[in-house]
Curated annotation (Swiss-Prot):
It holds the Pfam family DUF1328. Its main location: membrane. It is a multi-pass membrane protein. This is UPF0391 membrane protein Geob_0344. Coiled coil: none annotated. GO terms for cellular component: plasma membrane. It is found in: Cell membrane. It comes from the Bacteria. The chain crosses the membrane at residues 4-24, 33-53.
Amino acid sequence: MLRWAAIFFIIAIVAAVFGFTGIASAAAGIAKFLFILFLVVALIMLILGITAGTKITRH
């Protein structure tokens, strides 16, 4: 799960670079949306990875 969180975080950073710097000005709106989407997914995966890890180590 933590690996997926890292992957989605990297995707969010790449989307931010394209969206916020104006490199792809035609796709800036889409890139900003993807940044928010993948950032939220990365945070969810991070939380799930941490909670799943604590459940496994408690037993």
